[in-house]
């Protein structure tokens, strides 16, 4: 299913729903996250599932194939979106929260590379011992290179994480530099999943590096993530109750819907009325013509 989502959805989107560079949004990179999530799940199963080496090797190989399938595409989408930004077509309104989605593939890819590298160094290749690639001598270089690649991927995720936060906060100021607040919409939920996988990769880095800095930073990220989730839940519930979040600020019953349609029609009628100057139906007299 992850392969179908990564290839199929991306193909359909590019062939039948291509919006052009100006219409491209970070949501385009969501299908590739499916493949990276499956790869991360494969690493978790191999580490904690107590599988035999004969079962671990296929999972590890397929997981690396999924990473190779998805991560370069995520890099390509991020590059195209950066071109979109340079073209002064940055998202506006509540859609600007979607910038955080660009952090998702790198956070999930970083975690997948780290945990798969750790599994390889635990001896799965050495115990399998078949072929040239799946041998004891290659386990160390492959595992450590995978962990290092995970660190690099987390660095790229950090760029998009900081970029999204700056963009969201910058939208809260007007042109005079005064704070005017942030607009809430369902797009704010775009912060949760990418923030979560970015935090998960940071937690894994803290374990592999035995680093207090990464451990403290991952704790701060986790606390902030919980706060964002709670705020989104409260504001979403409030928006649903009042109806503003789904365009039902006049109420949920049928009469309120009719009143809304009536008010909208009256506004349109008022906008269509023009002052009659008596010049709308006049025709310029031709030379030599008489009335």
Regions found by a protein language model. Name each.
Residues 1-33, 43-67, 86-94:
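Membrane-interface helix-loop-helix junctions at boundaries between adjacent transmembrane segments
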Residues 21-43, 186-203:
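Intrinsic, low-complexity N-terminal interaction/targeting segments
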Residues 22-30, 58-67, 93-101, 146-150, ...:
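Transmembrane alpha-helices of multi-pass eukaryotic membrane proteins
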Residues 37-46, 108-121, 195-209:
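Hydrophobic alpha-helical transmembrane segments in multi-pass integral membrane proteins
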Residues 45, 54, 63, 70, ...:
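Membrane-interfacial loop- and helix-cap regions that link adjacent transmembrane helices
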Residues 199-241:
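A generic transmembrane alpha-helix motif of multi-pass inner-membrane proteins
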Residues 252-291:
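Intrinsically disordered, low-complexity terminal tails of fungal membrane proteins
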């Amino acid at each position: 299913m992850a392969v179908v989502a990564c290839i199929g959805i991306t193909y359909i989107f590019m062939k039948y729903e291509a919006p052009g560079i100006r219409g491209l949004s970070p949501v385009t990179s969501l299908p590739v996250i499916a493949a990276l999530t499956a790869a991360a799940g494969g690493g978790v199963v191999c580490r904690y599932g107590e599988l035999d080496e004969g079962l671990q090797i296929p999972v590890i190989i397929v997981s690396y194939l999924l990473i190779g399938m998805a991560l370069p595409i995520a890099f390509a989408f991020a590059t195209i979106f950066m071109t979109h930004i340079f073209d002064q077509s940055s998202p506006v309104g509540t859609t600007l929260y979607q910038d955080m989605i660009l952090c998702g593939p790198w956070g999930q890819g970083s975690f997948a590379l780290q945990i798969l590298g750790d599994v390889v160094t635990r001896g799965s290749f050495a115990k399998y011992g078949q072929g040239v690639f799946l041998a004891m001598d290659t386990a160390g270089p492959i595992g450590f290179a995978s962990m290092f690649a995970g660190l690099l991927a987390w660095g790229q995720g950090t760029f998009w994480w900081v970029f999204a936060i700056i963009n969201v906060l910058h939208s809260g100021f007007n042109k005079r530099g005064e704070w005017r607040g942030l607009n809430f919409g369902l797009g704010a939920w775009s912060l949760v999943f990418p923030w979560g996988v970015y935090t998960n990769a940071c937690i894994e880095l803290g374990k592999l590096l035995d680093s207090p800095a990464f451990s403290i930073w991952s704790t701060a990220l986790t606390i902030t993530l919980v706060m964002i989730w709670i705020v989104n839940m409260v504001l979403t519930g409030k928006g649903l109750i009042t109806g503003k979040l789904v365009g039902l600020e006049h109420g949920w019953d049928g009469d309120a819907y009719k009143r809304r349609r009536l008010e909208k029609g009256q506004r349109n009628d008022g906008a269509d009325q023009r002052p009659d100057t008596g010049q709308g139906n006049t025709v310029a007299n031709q030379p030599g013509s008489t009335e």
